[in-house]
């Protein structure tokens, strides 16, 4: 009330320098409206909904029992990971063509208008794909150095040669003896092993997820600006859509070299994108502001997901030579698309 009175007085006062200008008072009024009781409820519900969607990143821990490291290097672990990757490819393709792009088209479609916006969104898809290609070119995965590999083999061979010079006889009570030197205890030499390098594709997938969560935050906050009922329904629909998507993303992170717990932590960190998206929509205080951002963010994210699915993950599946495993991978790919199709139909 005090701010409204001050604004009215400022409008009737003669123009001239003073401690308060009309612009300053209007900004104060905007902040007062932004932090009103009704808006605080919208802020709370939007942030809680965005965080809940981000917490879906830990769901794969409950359904993926395999471990990274030695388990994934076994034949059984490798086949399990390839099955998850097949489902991940289907989920990503279904997400792009059945959810992200149709939603972007719905924001920009206008009856009787030009179709130039479709070309613009197509360019954003290409831009997202090329951006991820550029990032992977800038930060390529390091291939093992032949010289390092040779020195490692030389170290192990010299260690075995050193061990072969000694022999253990019963007369020495377990003490190594040698004809050319005095008796000495046997020395165990073990080569140094470096930790596994995380592939760039894992970080690209996290970047795409962060941008995708930003759009989810925009949708959640924009829905709560309409009404609490619409907001809760939108949050629930996004959660249903995200659960199979997170399982596929988790498999991609395991393939990139993350262990299960680190992959879960990195998935949770992408929830920050959803919080930022919700804050952006609430600060704009308009659905139109969120929609304008969504019209280019959704196709850009689609290009990133297409790059991850078709460039980073599909080549691993093409290495499969067993016809039975190949057929199973194709069926899982279609099942991933089918799950996304059912969820898209259910959300309409």
Swiss-Prot record:
The subcellular location is: Golgi apparatus membrane; Cytoplasmic vesicle membrane; Endoplasmic reticulum membrane
Q: Where is this region: Disordered?
A: 144-192
Q: Locate the motif XEXPHE-motif.
A: 241-246
Which residue intervals are annotated with compositional bias (Polar residues) in the record?
170-182
Q: Name one Pfam family in it.
A: Zip
Identify the main location.
Golgi
Q: Name one GO biological process term.
A: intracellular zinc ion homeostasis
Ranges of compositional bias, category Low complexity: 149-169
Has keyword Transmembrane helix?
A: yes
Q: Which GO terms describe its cellular component?
A: cytoplasmic vesicle membrane; endoplasmic reticulum membrane; Golgi membrane
- The record places the following residue ranges in the Cytoplasmic compartment, namely 1-45, 105-118, 241-262, 316-326
**InterPro entries listed in its UniProt record:** ZIP (IPR003689)
Output the Gene Ontology terms for molecular function: zinc ion transmembrane transporter activity
- Chemical reaction(s) catalysed: Zn(2+)(in) = Zn(2+)(out)
Q: Does the keyword Transmembrane helix apply?
A: yes
Residues in compartment: Lumenal: 67-83, 140-219, 284-294, 348
- Name the domain of life: Eukaryota
User: Which PANTHER family does this chain map to?
Assistant: ZINC TRANSPORTER SLC39A7 HISTIDINE-RICH MEMBRANE PROTEIN KE4, ZINC TRANSPORTER ZIP13
> What is the similarity comment for this entry?
Belongs to the ZIP transporter (TC 2.A.5) family.
Subunit details: Homodimer.
Query: What's the protein called, per UniProt?
Result: Zinc transporter ZIP13
Q: Which organism is it from?
A: Danio rerio
Organism placement in taxonomy: Eukaryota, Metazoa, Chordata, Craniata, Vertebrata
């Amino acid at each position: 009330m005090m701010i409204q009175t001050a604004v009215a007085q400022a409008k009737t006062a003669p123009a001239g320098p003073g401690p308060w200008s009309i612009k300053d008072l209007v900004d104060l009024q905007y902040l007062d409206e932004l932090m009103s009781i009704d808006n605080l409820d919208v802020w709370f519900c939007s942030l809680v909904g965005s965080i809940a969607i981000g917490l879906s990143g830990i769901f794969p821990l409950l359904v993926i029992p395999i471990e990274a490291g030695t388990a994934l290097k076994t034949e059984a672990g490798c086949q399990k990971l390839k099955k998850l990757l097949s489902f991940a490819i289907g989920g990503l393709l279904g997400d792009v063509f059945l959810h992200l792009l149709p939603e972007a088209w719905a924001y920009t479609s206008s009856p009787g208008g030009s179709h130039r916006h479709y070309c613009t969104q197509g360019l954003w898809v290409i831009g997202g794909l090329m951006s991820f290609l550029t990032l992977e070119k800038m930060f390529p995965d390091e291939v093992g150095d032949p010289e390092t590999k040779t020195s490692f083999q030389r170290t192990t061979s010299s260690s075995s040669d050193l061990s072969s010079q000694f022999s253990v006889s019963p007369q020495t009570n377990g003490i190594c003896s040698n004809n050319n030197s005095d008796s000495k205890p046997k020395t165990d030499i073990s080569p140094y092993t470096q930790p596994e390098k995380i592939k760039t594709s894992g970080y690209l997938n996290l970047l795409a997820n962060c941008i995708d969560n930003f759009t989810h935050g925009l949708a959640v906050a924009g829905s709560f600006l309409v009404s609490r009922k619409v907001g809760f329904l939108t949050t629930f629909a996004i959660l249903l859509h995200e659960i199979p998507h997170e399982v596929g993303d988790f498999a991609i992170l395991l393939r990139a070299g993350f262990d299960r717990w680190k992959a879960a932590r990195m998935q949770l960190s992408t929830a920050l994108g959803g919080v930022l998206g919700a804050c952006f929509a609430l600060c704009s205080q308009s659905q139109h502001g969120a929609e304008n951002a969504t019209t280019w963010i959704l196709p850009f994210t689609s290009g990133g997901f297409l790059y991850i699915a078709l460039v980073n993950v599909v080549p691993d599946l093409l290495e499969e030579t067993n016809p039975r495993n190949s057929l199973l991978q194709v069926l899982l790919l279609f099942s991933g698309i089918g799950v996304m199709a059912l969820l898209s139909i259910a959300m309409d």
